[in-house]
C-alpha cells in the first residue's frame, strides 16, 4: 500500500509528525483603537489536515521546528504541544507565508554564552541580537494561555555582572513580518529586551504576559524592555501585563502609526519614545502614536520622551547626540498612575550633564504636536511635590506640547508642580511650572 506523503515525512523526520489535533487559533481584533488601514493576519489557516506537530526535545528542538515550518508553510499549522523544547541552534523563520504557530509547550534556549555569541542574529542598532526571528506574510503565533517562552535571564544577568560586554539576546523577534498576530504567550526572564519588532508592518499583539524576577541582588535584571519597536509601522499592542525593570514599551527610530492600549505595567521606566537622536547625522522619525488606557505602577515614569541634545559644530561621528529627525503627533490619554516617580517626562537633553550645556547645543531633533491628557492617580515621594518634567533644549525645536486634565496627587498632598524649561508655544495652562 502506498503511504501518504505526510506519513512518509513522519518516518524520515522523527521530530516531526502530522497531527490530527488541530489547535484552535483565537479570534482577536484591535480594540478600541487601531491605526488607519490596519490589516493584521487574515485569521486561522483553513487546512485541518496540514498540522505539523513537533515533538518535545530537550537537546535541540530547532531542527524539528524548522522542518515543520517548511512542511506546513503556505496554509498549515506548526504545533508545539505541552512539553519542553530546548533551542540550541539559531532559528531563522523569516520565510513564512500563510501559516500558524501554536505554541503550547515550554520553550527555553540553551545556556551557552559562547554558542549564542557566534550564532545569534546580530543587529547594529544598539547591538541587539536574537535567538530566533519570525518574518513573512500572514502569520499567526499564539499560545492560547498555555505556551511559555523562558529566557533563563538570571544566567545572563549574572554573566553580565562579571562582564558588562556579554551579548544577551532578546527573547522573541520579528524581522520583515507583515500582516500577523502574536497572542496568548507567557514570557519569562528575558536576558535582554523581551520583544524586538523590526522592519515589520500590520502586527496585532494581544493577551501577552511578561514577568521578570531576579534571584541574585548583585546581578539584577537589566534592559528587560517589554517591546522595542524599530523601523516598523501599523502595530497594535494591547490587553497585556508586564512586570519588568526597564521600558514597558519603547518606540525606537522610525516607528510610525502605532497604538498601545489596555496595558498593565509594573516596575518599568514607562511607555517611552526613544531615546532618539543619539547618532550624529542619522535621521530618527517617530510619529502618529496613540497610547491609551495604561495602568502604570512603581515605575520611574508613566509617559516619557527621550531625545539627545546637539553636539558642537566641529564634532564628527558622535554617538552621544547630534542626530536629526522629529517626534510628531503623539498622544498619551487616559493614564492611571500609582506610586510612579513622574507621570510625564519630556527631555530633549537626554544624558546631558546639565541644562546649560544642553542649551548651548540644542537638539536637531524636533518635538512637536504632543498631547498628554487625562492622567489620574498618585506619584512616589521621590520628587514630591514635583510630578513631572518638561525640558526642551530650545523653544525653536519644541512646539505645541499640551498637558491637560491632570488629576495626580503627590504623597505630601501639596499642589503638584512640573519642572519646565524652554517650552516655547506649548499649552501648559492646566499645570503649575515651578
From Swiss-Prot:
An annotated GO BP: pectin catabolic process
A molecular-function term among this protein's GO annotations: hydrolase activity, acting on glycosyl bonds
Reaction catalysed by this enzyme: [(1->4)-alpha-D-galacturonosyl](n) + H2O = alpha-D-galacturonate + [(1->4)-alpha-D-galacturonosyl](n-1)
Active site, UniProt feature: 246, 269
Major localization listed first in the record, in broad terms: secreted
Glycosylation sites: 46, 57, 106, 199, 207, 254, 293, 329, 354, 400
Signal peptide limits: 1-19
UniProt keyword annotations, A-Z: Cell wall biogenesis/degradation, Disulfide bond, Glycoprotein, Glycosidase, Hydrolase, Repeat, Secreted, Signal
Enzyme Commission number(s): 3.2.1.67
Ranges for the PbH1 repeats: 232-253, 255-275
One protein family per Pfam: Glyco_hydro_28
Subcellular location: Secreted
GO cellular component: extracellular region
Positions of disulphide bridges: 248-265, 392-398
Enzyme class: hydrolase
Its biological purpose: Specific in hydrolyzing the terminal glycosidic bond of polygalacturonic acid and oligogalacturonates.
Family from the record: Belongs to the glycosyl hydrolase 28 family.
UniProt-recorded name of the protein: Probable exopolygalacturonase A
Amino acid at each position: 500500500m502506498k503511504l501518504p506523503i505526510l506519513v512518509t515525512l513522519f518516518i524520515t523526520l522523527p521530530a516531526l509528525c502530522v497531527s490530527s489535533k488541530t489547535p484552535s487559533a483565537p479570534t482577536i481584533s484591535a480594540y478600541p483603537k487601531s491605526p488607519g488601514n490596519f490589516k493584521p493576519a487574515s485569521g486561522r489557516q483553513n487546512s485541518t489536515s496540514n498540522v505539523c506537530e513537533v515533538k518535545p526535545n530537550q537537546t535541540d528542538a530547532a531542527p524539528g521546528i524548522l522542518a515543520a515550518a517548511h512542511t506546513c508553510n503556505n496554509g498549515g499549522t506548526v504545533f508545539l504541544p505541552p512539553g519542553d523544547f530546548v533551542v540550541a541552534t539559531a532559528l531563522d523563520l523569516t520565510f513564512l507565508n500563510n501559516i500558524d504557530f501554536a505554541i503550547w509547550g515550554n520553550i527555553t534556549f540553551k545556556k551557552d554564552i559562547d554558542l549564542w555569541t557566534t550564532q545569534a542574529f546580530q543587529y547594529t542598532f544598539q547591538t541587539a541580537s536574537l535567538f530566533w526571528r519570525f518574518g513573512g506574510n500572514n502569520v499567526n503565533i499564539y499560545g492560547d494561555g498555555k505556551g511559555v517562552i523562558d529566557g533563563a535571564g538570571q544566567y545572563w544577568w549574572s554573566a553580565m555582572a562579571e562582564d558588562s560586554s556579554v551579548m544577551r539576546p532578546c527573547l522573541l523577534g520579528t524581522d520583515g513580518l507583515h500582516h500577523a498576530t502574536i497572542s496568548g504567550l507567557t514570557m519569562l526572564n528575558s536576558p535582554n529586551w523581551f520583544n524586538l519588532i523590526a522592519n515589520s508592518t500590520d502586527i496585532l499583539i494581544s493577551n501577552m504576559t511578561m514577568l521578570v524576577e531576579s534571584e541574585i541582588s548583585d546581578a539584577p535584571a537589566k534592559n528587560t524592555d517589554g517591546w522595542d519597536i524599530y523601523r516598523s509601522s501599523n502595530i497594535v499592542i494591547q490587553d497585556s501585563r508586564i512586570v519588568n525593570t526597564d521600558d514597558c514599551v519603547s518606540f525606537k527610530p522610525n516607528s510610525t502609526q502605532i497604538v498601545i492600549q489596555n496595558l498593565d505595567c509594573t516596575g518599568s521606566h514607562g511607555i517611552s519614545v526613544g531615546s532618539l537622536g543619539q547618532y550624529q547625522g542619522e535621521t530618527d522619525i517617530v510619529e502618529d502614536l496613540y497610547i491609551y488606557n495604561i495602568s502604570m505602577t512603581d515605575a520611574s515614569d508613566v509617559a516619557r520622551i527621550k531625545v539627545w541634545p546637539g553636539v558642537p559644530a566641529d564634532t564628527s561621528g558622535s554617538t552621544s547626540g547630534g542626530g536629526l529627525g522629529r517626534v510628531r503627533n503623539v498622544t498619551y490619554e487616559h493614564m492611571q498612575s500609582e506610586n510612579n516617580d513622574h507621570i510625564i517626562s519630556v527631555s530633549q537633553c537626554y544624558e546631558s550633564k546639565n541644562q546649560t550645556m544642553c542649551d548651548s547645543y540644542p537638539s536637531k531633533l524636533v518635538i512637536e504636536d504632543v498631547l498628554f491628557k487625562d492622567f489620574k492617580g498618585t506619584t512616589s515621594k521621590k520628587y514630591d511635590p514635583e510630578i513631572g518634567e518638561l525640558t526642551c533644549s530650545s523653544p525653536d525645536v519644541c512646539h505645541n506640547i499640551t498637558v491637560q486634565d491632570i488629576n495626580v496627587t503627590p504623597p505630601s498632598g501639596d499642589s503638584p508642580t512640573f519642572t519646565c524649561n524652554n517650552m516655547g508655544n506649548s499649552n501648559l495652562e492646566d499645570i503649575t511650572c515651578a
